[in-house]
């Protein structure tokens, strides 16, 4: 049984009509960057809960979550309506294996995300531990519109902090926007456009690819890399070149 604790909302940041971030103070147990927990509210006499990844570094007591409002959702519209001072239930122990401990050493670590799935990478990069074993870090955030790239300022801040080791790239699929590639991640890999923009190759000799977000993107990218680059899923018992987390 999960141990639930009561958290207090300290900040609600509305990025767009649908995207928002919640900052919460709660007595949770220590977690590993890249992990997720569950948020819950009592609705009509029952606890409605969903899993959300931590965006904040584990050493930051401001627990941050990046959410999208599902119009007919049972929980997300209620979470979006919370105000500072309101209470929210949080599972105290984090879960998940989308963490650096599960990633083998390589020259270039590619971190690819769609939508709100940028969260785990931001947690990992803000903490900044266990990254010395990679020569290059690449963070790619794909969204429909440029307005949905909520954490671009933080990505740019991190890029400066890593002094050339981290390269960032945004992707939009429904419009063209300055500084962003246009299209979907699998197609941009297939055409070579993503590697060209970054200036690094994505191959099994030098790279490990982390994939987080839309299950279709994850599946399509895995299939493409398997077929065209002979890259394989990474398992503890059989090391490979791809680590993935589906976001729904």
UniProtKB/Swiss-Prot annotation:
The keyword Electron transport does not apply. Its EC number is 1.18.1.2, 1.19.1.1. One of its GO terms (biological process) is heme catabolic process. Keywords: Cytoplasm, FAD, Flavoprotein, NADP, Nucleotide-binding, Oxidoreductase. FAD binds at residues 50-53, 66, 74-76, 116, 247-248. Gene3D superfamilies: Nucleotide-binding domain of ferredoxin-NADP reductase (FNR) module (3.40.50.80), Translation factors (2.40.30.10). Disulfide bonds: none annotated. Belongs to the ferredoxin--NADP reductase type 1 family. Transports electrons between flavodoxin or ferredoxin and NADPH. This is Flavodoxin/ferredoxin--NADP reductase.
